[in-house]
């Protein structure tokens, strides 16, 4: 998915390195060209660059 198409508050699926898929919400940008996501219960915070977003994040269906 293109990073410029992300919507704050939108739900997405992140595919981890081991193949497991995790539902995450986009919570904004950190001002450094990186994108911040949280899991549904906000237990984990992920910060991705645009390459990771393009390769491993897709829209929630």
Question: Whereabouts are the PLM-identified features?
Answer:
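Intrinsically disordered, low-complexity, charged/polar segments
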Residues: 42-61
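Coiled-coil-like amphipathic alpha-helices with heptad-repeat character
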Residues: 6, 29, 49-53
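Short polar catalytic/cofactor-binding loops
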Residues: 17
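Mixed-charge, Lys/Arg-rich low-complexity intrinsically disordered regions
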Residues: 1-7
